[in-house]
Amino acid sequence: MTENTKDTPESETGWRCAVCGFLFSGERPPRSCPRCGSPGAEFLPAGDHTVFRYDGEPFDVLLINGSSHRVGNTGFMLDCAAEELNARGVSFRRYNLSEYSIEHCWCCYSVKAEYCTYPCRNWQDDMPGFHALLATAKAVIVASPINWNNMPGRLKDFLDRTTCMQNLFHLDKPGLTEGKVVGILVCGHEDGALKTALDIFLYFQQMGYILAPFGIGYRTHGAEFNSSTDSGFFRNDQRVREDIKGVVSNVVEFMQLDIESQLKGRLAPVSE
């Protein structure tokens, strides 16, 4: 194993851990990351990053995995969500934030409100592509782990970067998100699930999203267990699947009422 793939033989391939960035040379990824311990499934082919942009194809629901781990418990929750959307014939797109380059918000608003514009002034990373996805999707389902009773920093950076969409209302410009639907899924080892969900929702509420009825689903394992047993618990617990199916179903039912079109131009934007 090596962290230098510049001289990788033709028979080998460069792999990058999506969690910590460790580079590995070999025909296939390692069984686990030598640096952060993540399973080999977290590795992606290494190579030059292509800036992400939305291709313009319409779809209904945007699925966001806010975890640093693509294939962990949070990813499993989105697997279940995707299964339910497929079963209902609802179009969707799924993204793992760990696979994309999303920089910290520049906080242009703190300098001058007019500087926080849409499109975002930072057009060099992948977030402008996600801005377009948010403007297009009728509904969003966000899945998040619990990090210290809150969402992980990766997801917070993503949500911080939606400020340019929220600021449209302060600049008296047409909004792009009011009346859309949001659902939230949270999992973790112990405490903080509901707080995490509500912290996430506050961002969307400030953009005019409506939380689907019974639109929050969460499950924790417990501090008395070793975290290495969480994966087996979540994948074998029937309540997890039922709750996710319920949240997804509620989001879809609410979305199909087309509240967004009914409220267009009728809402008074009240946000920070």
Model-identified regions with their sequence ranges:
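Short Cys/His-rich zinc-binding micro-motifs
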Residues: 17-26
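Short, glycine-/small-residue-rich phosphate/pyrophosphate-handling segment
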Residues: 171-217
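N-terminal beta1-alpha1-beta2 submodule of the flavodoxin-like/Rossmannoid cofactor-binding fold
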Residues: 2-3, 21-22, 35-37, 45-172, ...
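Mobile beta-alpha loop/short-helix "lid" or hinge segments that flank ligand
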Residues: 97-103, 174-176, 207-230
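Cysteine-rich micro-motifs
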Residues: 28-39
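The −1 position to Zn-ligating cysteines in a subset of zinc-ribbon hairpins
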Residues: 16, 32, 104
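Short metal-coordination and nucleic-acid-contact micro-motifs, chiefly zinc-binding Cys/His arrays
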Residues: 11-13, 29, 98-101, 178
